[in-house]
């Protein structure tokens, strides 16, 4: 074979190799282009669907008044007349009940969609997402009260079969009453931590509204939210803000508070005592509460949370000093000289004792620090009480 022929064959083989490599590259590009084409076709389909949806005419919002047997229902447009309309075949009938919010076709007024229930953002904000970090071990001197609270709230939620076997209904609600700073709110937080339930906390004054009917609507939506999130514990702090005794002569604002109270009474009458919604309320002024609120069937169990006795004060001091470095501190002496102090006072005393130690650049707390803290906390309270009393005597 001549040199020219050898050169020709080498060039031919190289060219064939090049063409094969080029074919593989083109095939890869074709596959990539086909994948891009499929992706763009899906995007085009999505955009066309979105465009079609946006071009649909708006629907009316209405409320179901009554569901009829022949695939029809009576609905009411907001602030408008009532209509007998058809129900679209894709609507789930078991979810279509009186009070449900629905979308109505603009031409035929047929029910075409079920809408979620509307709730005031204030009500949604009442739900506590994270469980409080307070446990039963963080509460001192309230063993009897904690036992009664757990029997009334925790036991029916965890073991409802016990009440069914005995044949009694558990309490619907519990009222905690007593002086300020004695642990009422702390008990509710500890219960919410221990029970695997939704915890809704609301202060009574948050349910008072300016315009007619707003407070009652908030109470209704509060209980609706509790039923949806069941099992649920509703804690109403400072309930005397809406639960005070009703008088014959009232102003416009007081009448609105009375409407809110009546809605609360109606809601508590309306739910099953064996259900998964429990109500706890707290107040410092049980003497001004309306008698209708305290009758059996509403707040069935009244639990007094008094000022702690000597043993209670000692337990509370142990709770608040368990992470403190103490040196030659006799807590029994501190408990003895703090008669009449609340749990909040004792916590303040422990904090002030620590502040006295920090002031002197010490990492431990002594008996002298506690004695100075007792004088500072309880002494200031007594001085303030004397000033208020003398002011009332002088000025009436």
From Swiss-Prot:
<comment type="subunit">
    <text>Homohexamer. The hexameric complex has a two-ring architecture resembling a top hat that caps the 20S proteasome core at one or both ends. Upon ATP-binding, the C-terminus of PAN interacts with the alpha-rings of the proteasome core by binding to the intersubunit pockets.</text>
</comment>
<dbReference type="GO" id="GO:0016887">
    <property type="term" value="F:ATP hydrolysis activity"/>
</dbReference>
<keyword id="KW-0547">Nucleotide-binding</keyword>
<dbReference type="InterPro" id="IPR050221">
    <property type="entry name" value="26S_Proteasome_ATPase"/>
</dbReference>
<comment type="function">
    <text>ATPase which is responsible for recognizing, binding, unfolding and translocation of substrate proteins into the archaeal 20S proteasome core particle. Is essential for opening the gate of the 20S proteasome via an interaction with its C-terminus, thereby allowing substrate entry and access to the site of proteolysis. Thus, the C-termini of the proteasomal ATPase function like a 'key in a lock' to induce gate opening and therefore regulate proteolysis.</text>
</comment>
<keyword id="KW-0963">Cytoplasm</keyword>
<keyword id="KW-0067">ATP-binding</keyword>
<dbReference type="Pfam" id="PF00004">
    <property type="entry name" value="AAA"/>
</dbReference>
<keyword id="KW-0143">Chaperone</keyword>
<feature type="binding site">
    <location>
        <position position="320"/>
    </location>
    <ligand>
        <name>ATP</name>
    </ligand>
</feature>
<feature type="coiled-coil region">
    <location>
        <begin position="16"/>
        <end position="57"/>
    </location>
</feature>
<dbReference type="GO" id="GO:0005737">
    <property type="term" value="C:cytoplasm"/>
</dbReference>
<dbReference type="GO" id="GO:0005524">
    <property type="term" value="F:ATP binding"/>
</dbReference>
<dbReference type="InterPro" id="IPR023501">
    <property type="entry name" value="Nucleotidase_PAN"/>
</dbReference>
<dbReference type="InterPro" id="IPR003960">
    <property type="entry name" value="ATPase_AAA_CS"/>
</dbReference>
<feature type="region of interest" description="Docks into pockets in the proteasome alpha-ring to cause gate opening">
    <location>
        <begin position="394"/>
        <end position="396"/>
    </location>
</feature>
<dbReference type="InterPro" id="IPR027417">
    <property type="entry name" value="P-loop_NTPase"/>
</dbReference>
<dbReference type="InterPro" id="IPR003593">
    <property type="entry name" value="AAA+_ATPase"/>
</dbReference>
<dbReference type="Pfam" id="PF16450">
    <property type="entry name" value="Prot_ATP_ID_OB_C"/>
</dbReference>
<dbReference type="GO" id="GO:0043335">
    <property type="term" value="P:protein unfolding"/>
</dbReference>
<keyword id="KW-0647">Proteasome</keyword>
<dbReference type="InterPro" id="IPR041569">
    <property type="entry name" value="AAA_lid_3"/>
</dbReference>
<feature type="binding site">
    <location>
        <begin position="181"/>
        <end position="186"/>
    </location>
    <ligand>
        <name>ATP</name>
    </ligand>
</feature>
<dbReference type="InterPro" id="IPR003959">
    <property type="entry name" value="ATPase_AAA_core"/>
</dbReference>
<protein>
    <recommendedName>
        <fullName>Proteasome-activating nucleotidase</fullName>
    </recommendedName>
</protein>
<keyword id="KW-0175">Coiled coil</keyword>
<dbReference type="Pfam" id="PF17862">
    <property type="entry name" value="AAA_lid_3"/>
</dbReference>
<dbReference type="GO" id="GO:0022623">
    <property type="term" value="C:proteasome-activating nucleotidase complex"/>
</dbReference>
<comment type="similarity">
    <text>Belongs to the AAA ATPase family.</text>
</comment>
<dbReference type="GO" id="GO:0010498">
    <property type="term" value="P:proteasomal protein catabolic process"/>
</dbReference>
<dbReference type="InterPro" id="IPR012340">
    <property type="entry name" value="NA-bd_OB-fold"/>
</dbReference>
<dbReference type="InterPro" id="IPR032501">
    <property type="entry name" value="Prot_ATP_ID_OB_2nd"/>
</dbReference>
């Amino acid at each position: 074979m001549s040199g020219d022929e050898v050169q020709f064959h080498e060039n031919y083989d190289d060219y064939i190799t090049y063409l094969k490599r080029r074919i593989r590259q083109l095939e890869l590009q074709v596959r990539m282009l086909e994948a891009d084409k499929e992706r763009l076709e899906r995007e085009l389909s999505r955009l066309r669907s979105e465009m079609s949806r946006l071009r649909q005419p708006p629907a009316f919002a209405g409320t179901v008044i009554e569901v009829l047997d022949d695939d029809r229902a009576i609905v009411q447009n907001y602030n408008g007349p009532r209509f007998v309309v058809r129900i679209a075949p894709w609507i789930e009938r078991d979810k279509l009940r009186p009070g449900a919010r629905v979308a109505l076709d603009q031409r035929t007024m047929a029910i075409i969609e079920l809408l979620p229930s509307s709730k005031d953002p204030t009500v949604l904000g009442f739900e506590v997402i994270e469980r409080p970090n307070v446990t039963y071990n963080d509460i001192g001197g309230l063993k009897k009260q904690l036992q009664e609270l757990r029997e009334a709230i925790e036991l029916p939620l965890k073991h409802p079969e016990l009440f069914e076997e005995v044949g009694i209904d558990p309490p619907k609600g519990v009222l905690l009453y007593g002086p300020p700073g004695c642990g009422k709110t702390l008990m509710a937080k500890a219960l919410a931590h221990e029970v695997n339930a939704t915890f809704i906390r609301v202060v009574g004054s948050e349910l008072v509204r300016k315009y007619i009917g707003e407070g009652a609507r908030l109470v209704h939506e509060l209980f609706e939210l509790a039923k949806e999130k069941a099992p649920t514990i509703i804690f109403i702090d400072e309930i005397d803000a809406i639960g005070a005794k009703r008088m014959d002569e009232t102003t416009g604002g007081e009448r609105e508070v009375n409407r809110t109270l009546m809605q609360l009474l109606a809601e508590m009458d309306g739910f099953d005592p064996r259900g998964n919604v429990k109500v706890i309320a707290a107040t410092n002024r049980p003497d001004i509460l309306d008698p209708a609120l305290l009758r059996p069937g509403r707040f069935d169990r009244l639990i007094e949370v008094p000022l702690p006795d000597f043993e209670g004060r000692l337990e509370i001091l142990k709770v608040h000093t368990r992470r403190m470095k103490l040196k030659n501190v006799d807590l029994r002496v501190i408990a003895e000289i703090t008669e009449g102090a609340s749990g909040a006072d004792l916590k303040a005393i422990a904090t002030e004792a620590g502040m006295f130690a920090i002031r002197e650049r010490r990492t431990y707390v002594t008996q002298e620090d506690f004695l100075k803290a007792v004088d500072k906390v309880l002494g200031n309270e007594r001085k303030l009480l004397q000033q208020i009393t003398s002011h009332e005597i002088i000025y009436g």
